[in-house]
Every structure is written in structure tokens, then in C-alpha cells.
Amino acid sequence: MRVEERLLKYVSYWTTSDEECRQIPSSERQFELGKVLEQELRDLGLEKVTLTDHCYVYGLLPATKGYADKPAVGFISHMDTAPDFSGKDVKPQIIPDYDGNDVLLKGSGAYLKISDFPTLKTLKGRTLITTDGTTLLGADDKAGVSEIMTAVEQIITEKIPHGDIWIGFTPDEEVGSGADLFDLDYFKAKFAYTVDGDYEGEVAYENFNAASASFEITGVNVHPGEAKDIMINAALVGCEIASLLPENETPAHTEGREGFYHLTDFSGDIAHAKVNYIVRDHDKATFEKRLDTLRGIEKKMNEKYHADTVKLNIQHSYSNMLEVIEKNEYVVAIAKKAIKNVGLEPVSRPVRGGTDGARLSFMGLLCPNLGTGGYGFHGPFEHISVEGMDTAVSVIKEIVKITAE
């Protein structure tokens, strides 16, 4: 099966994760794709194939005879799609020989614009896959899943010699818990790669430090005609909290290694309000200062109004894997060599996000991130080219060849 056929098949499954649910998987629907992948791995002849009760899929392609002493390598992608935008009833648009112009997304009437996504120019002449504008595409990370599955199939059919190859597909990466129950006692790779990036030829090993922060605000509600010096409007306190953070330190005003505070949602009324943020920074010390800023706001609000008006809850999400990877640079060197072998110059940028690999690297499994060839993730402008996916398949195969040398 061709890589694009797999992608179109996998995106037909609704696998949006649920950031409000603390169990794994956060949405039972992720099992539908998990069962499909489990069966496909079995059909390809892999061993130790399992779908766990928590929706992790594992499989082993055993080493070619005479190659059992070579390092075991793993490839990992996630099955869920981001809750930021609908992932239900995805209707991809397939555009052969893309002309390099803006693309009409026929379901919504919106346009995928070159002015917003300049990399579109580089995809001219390729087969482009987009959304119809009413959902995200799900290339993040079903493109990665497709590329791994296709690479495994080609390694088998082309009889490429290899050491042990472990495959892992996770739930709930998009809500920060994809690595929580990843079984490293079962998945016995020496090192691995997530296939969850964007740029073709990308190998990323520096990501954000990340946390979520929630302000719970309890107001005092009385009749507005008798409210003087009594009422505390929780919704207005929430607005005040937002105003105390620097307005130029948001995702819309930052790039590269610049961190941010991101207001993800705000709900409430006079009696109760909730303000949710995610906090990101590549530098660990600066990241901790950001969290201290939030704690300072909590203290200030409780001093201004009364104790327990505001309660802040901070949850750590993941750390910058650079801290671990820079001590084990061989995993990046292998990926860069593989990328050069397919005719590309490796791209390594600080990832303005996180991957399962960031968590796994701190758990003992070194795990940089490879590009899938997709762009515009988490929304209706998500797109990918067939040729970009083919390149990712080739990179995976080259990594396998290099580790078997």
C-alpha cells in the first residue's frame, strides 16, 4: 500500500483526544485506529504485536539473520489528533500537479494561502493533500504513522538487512500524556525516533519546556443594586489576570527560541471563572521564571480581593530533550546521515512544541524527532505532499540501513 493510501485510510478514523479527560486514552475512539494498526502489523508478519488496554500499539520486526547484534532502533508516532479543531469526518482534497497558487478549500470557502504558508511554493508540481476547510487533516500525526508502516513494508519486501526494529503508536500525544504509559520494558529499542515533525529533512532535538496553568476564580455574587464593596466579579478578575501578562509574549508575537504565555480558554460568570494557559520556553531558567510570574499573580489577586479568590494549578507537561540528547549526539548524527543519503540537507530547528520523544528521552529512550513533510498542523490549513511523505519513508529506511552497518 502506498504511503498516501495509508494516510487517506487513517484520517478517516476520528481520533481526537480529549484534554479534559485524565484517563488514557482520553477518548475511546482512538482504539478504532489502534485495532486497525495492530492488524496491519500482524499482516506484515511482525512479532510481539499488541494493543494494550491503554491504546498503545507495539510491534517488532526481528533482525535479519546475522544482524541480531546490531543496535535495535525504534520508530514512534501518535494516533490522536489535536482537540484544537474538529477531526471528525475529514474530507481530504487531493490535488495532483499542484500549480503553486492559493488553494480553495471547498467545504468552507476559505483559501490555503501562500502568503500564510510560504513553503507552499516549494510544493509546486507535487501531489498536494489538503483539508476541505471544515476539519483538520490529521497528518499530525497520521502521516508519521503512514510513513512508518510504509517503510516497514518496504524493508520487508525489498529484503533490506536490519537489526531489530521496534514500532510504537501512542494515544494522547496532543494532550501531553502520550508517553505516560509507554512500556519501555516491552519496547526494547536502544534508541528511537518519533516521526512527528513537519519540514522534510528535519531532525529535531530541542523542544519547549512546557506546563499548563489553570486559574480557578471564586467570586462573590450579590444583587448589582446592592453590590458596592461586596461583589467580586470572577469574570472581571479573570480579565485582570490576563492583563497582567506581557501582551507581546504570546504565540502570535514570538518565534524561534522565544517563549510565551498562551491563553487557551476562558469561561465564567460573576460567581466563578476559569482561565487556562499553557506556558512554553526553551530555556529552563526562563521557563521557571514564567511559572513564578503566574504564582505572583495568584498572590497579588488574593491580596487585592481576599484569600482563596484565586487558586492556581500548574501541571508540568514535558521538558527540553536537548538536555539529554546533547550528551548522546550519535542519535542525531545517524539521522543527519540518513537525510543526506536521500539528497537533502538536514534541518534542525528548535521545536516550538513537544513530542512523545521529549518525554521518552528523559525516561531513558533517546528519541529525536523526524519531519513528516506536513505543514499547518492543528487546523483547517493543514497540508502535506505525497512526495514529502515518500521522502520521510526513505529517511526511515536509511536510518535502518545505517544502524545495520
Model-identified regions with their sequence ranges:
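Active-site metal-coordination/substrate-binding segment of hydrolases
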Residues: 67-161, 391
